[in-house]
Amino acid sequence: MEWTRGRILGRGSTATVYAAAGHNSDEILAVKSSEVHRSEFLQREAKILSSLSSPYVIGYRGSETKRESNGVVMYNLLMEYAPYGTLTDAAAKDGGRVDETRVVKYTRDILKGLEYIHSKGIVHCDVKGSNVVISEKGEAKIADFGCAKRVDPVFESPVMGTPAFMAPEVARGEKQGKESDIWAVGCTMIEMVTGSPPWTKADSREDPVSVLYRVGYSSETPELPCLLAEEAKDFLEKCLKREANERWTATQLLNHPFLTTKPDIEPVLVPGLISNSPTSVTDQTFWRSVEEEEEEETEEIQKDSRDLDRLSLWGCYSERIGRLKCVGGLDGTRCDMEGGDWIMVRARCEGTMISGSQKELIISENVLVGEL
C-alpha cells in the first residue's frame, strides 16, 4: 500500500503521529512513526492491534520498516483515522462535560470493545478519555495499545498506565488484569461526567505521587458525581470495587440497567473542519513536569524508557512516577491552554464525509511517500 505522509497529529517522546493518505483510495490514515531503535513499544502495539478486529477498536491498516531520505530507519504503524477526536476532546467541546445520553452510548461502546479484547486474552492497561476516539460514524473506539499486553498467568510484566486511572492493585505494583481495565472504565465515565479524571480537580494540580499512593494504599474510592442518578452511581460502584475480584466483568456491565434501559442513539456530531487539542490519541507520553527543576532528570528518564521492563515497581514512588511519564501521561489536570509551552498533539477533521479539498488540507505539508 502506497501512502503519502502529511501533517503532524501528535508527538510523544519516542513516536510521532501523522495524517496520511493512501494513493489508491480516499481513506485518510493515522500513521505512528518511530525510529527503529526506539520502536519496541510501537512494534508491540502493532503486533497486538493487528490481531484485533472490532467496530469498537481502532482499525489496523498495516506496518512497515522504511529508510527515510535522511538515512534514518523508521518503523511505521498505519491505523484508522478518527475524525472526531477523543472523548476528552468531546468533553472540552461541550464545556468540559459529556451529556448523559452520550455518556451511556460511549460507555456501552467502550465495554463492547473491552469485552472483545478481553475475550482475546488482551488487557488494554490504559483506558481513559484521551485513549478513546470517536469514529466518523459516531462510535467510541478504544485506541492507543502502547501499554496493552496479553494476559499471562505465569509471567507478570511491569504495570503501565496513567496513575489517576490505575486500579488499586496496579498502583501497588501487584498485577494488571482485565479487572484493572474495568476500574479504568469507571474512572473514564467520571471523567466524561465531570470533565476531570478522579482524584483531581479541574482547577488544581495534584502531585501524581500522592495520587498513586491514595489509589493504592488508602481505603478510598473515587468520589461519585452527585449529579448522577442512583442507577448510574450503582453502575460506577460495580466498576470501582477496591477488591479486583468483586468488580463486574465487561459482559455483566453491558447488562446493567444503566445501559440496558437507555435507547441506543445516534450521536450528534458537530460539523467543522480542523481543531487542535493538547491531548494525545496514540501516545501516552504527553506529560507536564510537576516541578520545573525535574525537566533535566525527565529527559534522561525518557532516554532510558526502553529499560522499563527491568524496572521494579516496588521501588521509590518518585522513580516509578518518573518512568511512568514515559509511557502514560497523567491527564488529571486542566492546564492553561493559552500558555506558550503547549504543543499541538491532536488534530481533528470533523464531518462524516471527506471531500477532495478537505483531504488535501488534512495531509498538507507532505514530506514523503511510503510503501507498504
UniProtKB/Swiss-Prot annotation:
Please give the Pfam families that the UniProt record associates with this protein.
Pkinase (PF00069)
Q: Does the keyword Ligase apply?
A: no
GO MF annotation terms: ATP binding; MAP kinase kinase kinase activity; protein kinase binding; protein serine kinase activity; protein serine/threonine kinase activity
Q: What class of enzyme is it?
A: transferase
Q: Which domain of life is it from?
A: Eukaryota
Active-site annotation: D126 (proton acceptor)
Induction, per UniProt? Strongly induced by abscisic acid (ABA). Accumulates in response to osmotic stresses (e.g. mannitol and NaCl).
Q: Which reaction does it catalyse?
A: L-seryl-[protein] + ATP = O-phospho-L-seryl-[protein] + ADP + H(+); L-threonyl-[protein] + ATP = O-phospho-L-threonyl-[protein] + ADP + H(+)
The answer to keyword Ribonucleoprotein applying to this record is no
Q: Where in the cell is it found?
A: Nucleus
Per the record, residues carrying Phosphoserine are S312
Q: Provide the E.C. number(s) assigned to this enzyme.
A: 2.7.11.25
An example of a Gene Ontology BP annotation on this entry?
abscisic acid-activated signaling pathway
In this chain, ATP is annotated as bound at L9, G10, R11, G12, S13, T14, A15, T16, V17, K32
One GO cellular component, as annotated: nucleus
Which keywords appear in this protein's UniProt record, sorted alphabetically?
A: Abscisic acid signaling pathway, ATP-binding, Kinase, Nucleotide-binding, Nucleus, Phosphoprotein, Serine/threonine-protein kinase, Transferase
The job of this chain, per UniProt, is described as: Component of the abscisic acid (ABA) signaling pathway that may act as ABA signal transducer in the context of abiotic stresses. Triggers MPK7 activation in a MKK3-dependent manner. Mediates the ABA-dependent activation of the MKK3-MPK7 module.
Protein family membership: Belongs to the protein kinase superfamily. Ser/Thr protein kinase family.
Q: Quaternary structure?
A: Binds to MKK3.
Entry protein name:
Mitogen-activated protein kinase kinase kinase 17
What is the protein's species of origin?
Answer: Arabidopsis thaliana
Q: Which gene encodes it?
A: MAPKKK17
